[in-house]
């Protein structure tokens, strides 16, 4: 099975339509990967589905980079 980091990066690449090598840990969804607000909402929904978790809106607003998404999922896995 893939690591959480690999799974998060794969989802981000697929959701934002960017090459996997562009999805670096310190990449910002908006500034580096070209996401808009709708993209980020869809990304959070995809992460929730993949990891069977719920990300509250106030937490989702803080997830603005690849590393932040990885850290959140790592911290909230059952």
UniProtKB/Swiss-Prot annotation:
Biological processes annotated in GO: fatty acid biosynthetic process; lipid A biosynthetic process; lipid biosynthetic process; response to xenobiotic stimulus
Domain of life, per lineage: Bacteria
Outcome following mutation: residue 37 to A/T: Loss of phosphopantetheinylation, and inhibition of cell growth
SUPFAM superfamilies xrefs: ACP-like
Cellular compartments annotated: Cytoplasm
PROSITE patterns for this protein: CARRIER, PHOSPHOPANTETHEINE
Associated pathway: Lipid metabolism; fatty acid biosynthesis
Disulfide cross-links: none
Residues annotated with O-(pantetheine 4'-phosphoryl)serine modification: 37
PTM info: 4'-phosphopantetheine is transferred from CoA to a specific serine of apo-ACP by AcpS. This modification is essential for activity because fatty acids are bound in thioester linkage to the sulfhydryl of the prosthetic group.
Keywords, ordered alphabetically: Cytoplasm, Fatty acid biosynthesis, Fatty acid metabolism, Lipid biosynthesis, Lipid metabolism, Phosphopantetheine, Phosphoprotein
Pfam families assigned to the protein according to its UniProt record, in alphabetical order: PP-binding
Domain Carrier: 2-77
CC per GO annotation: cytoplasm; cytosol; membrane
GO MF annotations, alphabetized: acyl binding; acyl carrier activity; lipid binding; phosphopantetheine binding
Function: Carrier of the growing fatty acid chain in fatty acid biosynthesis.
HAMAP family linked: Acyl_carrier
Family, as annotated: Belongs to the acyl carrier protein (ACP) family.
Quaternary context: Interacts with MukB.
Name of the protein in question: Acyl carrier protein
Recorded name of the encoding gene: acpP
């Amino acid at each position: 099975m893939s690591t959480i980091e690999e799974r998060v990066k794969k989802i981000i690449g697929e959701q934002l339509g960017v090459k996997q090598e562009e999805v670096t840990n310190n990449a910002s969804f908006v500034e580096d990967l070209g996401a808009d607000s709708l993209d980020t909402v869809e990304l959070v929904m995809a992460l929730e589905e993949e990891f069977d978790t719920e990300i509250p809106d106030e937490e989702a607003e803080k997830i603005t980079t690849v590393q932040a998404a990885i850290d959140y999922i790592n911290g909230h896995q059952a």
